[in-house]
A protein has these predicted regions:
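A charged, aromatic-enriched C-terminal amphipathic alpha-helix characteristic of glycosyltransferases
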Residues: 61-62, 265, 272-328
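Short hydrophobic beta-strand element within catalytic cores of glycosyltransferases
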Residues: 238-242
Length: 338
């Protein structure tokens, strides 16, 4: 099958530093090629995917329809990772990676990134974003620090809650930043007792920290669509303490972490690592359907359905739409006290 992966934007595939969606698309492309399929990648000019053809728009392109000319005639299906900019003549599938606005509608052939994410948008169709385990280091030997990997400038990611849980557990919290952190936040972080701020790191440095961390603290206060940082931590052998929001109950099991809305309960899990096995954490990814090959196989099933039936939906089934009243960044409950 000839699959065209489409994600035009400022961040290359794979990203040089931060870019979870772009990294995931890279892994998906790797897996499709490994399974014997032909892949074209339409992306930023600095992108690369061994074994795939790269197509991109010229930086001075003024024609708003020029993107259509990038799709090869031999393409069987186009896999968009952003809303198409107009009508598409080829069969296509759209993956939505974020949360929609209340009442926002999506094309019939739309797939989401977790069961809960799909339900929040009136759908049953989802594919977990798989990672390539070979891109991560694993060790049974862990060190005494916790990690925070998230866009900390978003209140919903709850950096303050993570710092409080680590401090109560008597453990240093190491915070990896992202490119869009406000300067005031970068100045504030180093002053927090028990927090070490690393700023924006490349993949090797991030993977090294993941391979040695005791755990990942991920106390989000919103409906998390997926949370790639969670599976990246698990495959590296770090257990996860998090809130039970969005997709997280689908990923974190009692053998691989703790879920709670109370800081003190998460702190207890941080304090007692003997409850969790690094090998069990890694196996959760390898055997739980969270690898890039798992993802590719599930998408191939959806591609085949679209090509044979024309649509993912059943006759008379409404197109996906964000639930009325769903507010993505509304802060969900969190108990920060004792």
């Amino acid at each position: 099958m000839h699959v065209t992966l489409y994600k035009l934007g400022k961040i290359p595939i794979p990203p040089k530093l931060y870019g979870g969606t772009e990294r995931y698309i890279y892994w998906l492309g790797q897996a499709l090629i490994a399974l014997g399929h032909r892949v074209t990648l339409i992306a930023n000019a600095e992108s690369h995917l061994p074994g795939a053809e790269l197509r991109t728009l010229a930086s001075d392109e003024k024609n708003p329809q020029a993107w259509l000319n990038l799709i090869p005639e031999s393409t069987d299906i186009v896999h968009f990772h952003e809303q198409p900019r107009g009508p598409v003549s080829k069969p296509y599938l759209l993956t939505i990676h974020g949360n929609g606005r209340p009442g926002e509608q999506f094309p019939p052939n739309t797939v989401f990134v977790s069961r809960r994410h799909a339900a929040n948008h009136g759908s049953r169709r989802f594919v977990y974003p798989g990672i390539n385990p070979d891109d991560f280091r694993f060790s049974e030997r862990r060190e005494d620090y916790a990690l925070f990997l998230a866009k900390a400038s978003w209140k919903v990611k709850n950096l303050q809650g993570a710092a409080a849980a680590a401090r109560r557990a008597g453990l240093e919290l190491r915070v990896i930043g992202s490119r869009d952190w406000p300067l005031r936040l970068q100045r504030w972080l180093p002053r927090i007792r028990g927090v070490r701020y690393y700023g924006l790191l490349g993949r090797p440095e991030k993977e090294e920290l993941l391979s040695r961390a005791r755990c990942l603290i991920f106390p989000v206060r919103w409906e998390e669509p997926f949370g790639l940082a969670v599976t990246e931590a698990l495959v590296s052998g770090a257990y996860v303490v998090a809130t039970p929001y969005g997709s997280l109950p689908e990923i974190v099991t009692p053998e691989t972490g703790r879920l709670s809305t109370r800081m003190v309960e998460l702190a207890e899990a941080v304090k007692h690592p003997q409850q969790f096995s690094p090998a069990a954490c890694r196996d959760r990814v390898l055997r739980g359907g969270f690898t890039h090959l798992d993802t590719a196989r599930k998408y191939l099933d959806y591609y085949e359905r679209i090509l044979t039936r024309g649509s993912l939906g059943e006759d008379g089934e409404p197109a996906p739409a964000t639930k009325p009243g769903f507010m993505a960044k509304h802060l969900l409950p969190w108990g920060n006290g004792a």
